[in-house]
């Protein structure tokens, strides 16, 4: 038999079993379409999940914290030596120690509170901390330091004389203009409430220091990751903490051999693919790590 005969025989057989042939072809088509749809849904879910995570911050940022306990031998210290070691790791773009404190702010009769982050400002843009209005802060002076607040800070001020009613206009805009108002900062609420203590000469003096701020700009709160926060030079915030030790909890040096250590260090990976490898090296050195990249990797 020739090829044409085989072809003709196939057509005859197909014509005798039209229903079965159509159903088979239709089933295969539906199966292929289902596979394509499932793959598309999976890719779409991954993309949507990634967008949601990225809205909370950078997928290439790693938070490094001290070991949870000191049992089982020598404890890794999160100090300047460790910071330098992190900087030398392959794939690392930027590293900064993070000093943290909480302070009270005053603008006229309005009061607010802010979480302060003292960082190496030269690394700020690597961690997506940059001004959306104004400019990056410098070191400023001891009595009038420069600071950059998040763009939700103004709306958080409230009036203590009106049962802490938020300082907002009728249209919902903040009454406090951070970039053009006089803003003062203190770590002692008594400074704001008018309470005083007796000085050495018997006169009434405020218990804590009051600083007049120079606000250089406003940055994004990154989907509430840094809600009502301020960023300033790390050294300047360390000076404040030292000068206001009565109102800010101090880290004990007994367990660190007298060395200055940090509660938090930020590490920025140059590429997303490097995050897990860098985090593993840091964990192997005895530290704890956390990254939004961990959440993303968990659904892959």
Language model regions located:
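Juxtamembrane loop-helix boundary motifs flanking transmembrane segments in multi-pass membrane proteins
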Residues: 2-6, 74, 78, 291-298
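Alpha-helical transmembrane segments
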Residues: 33-61
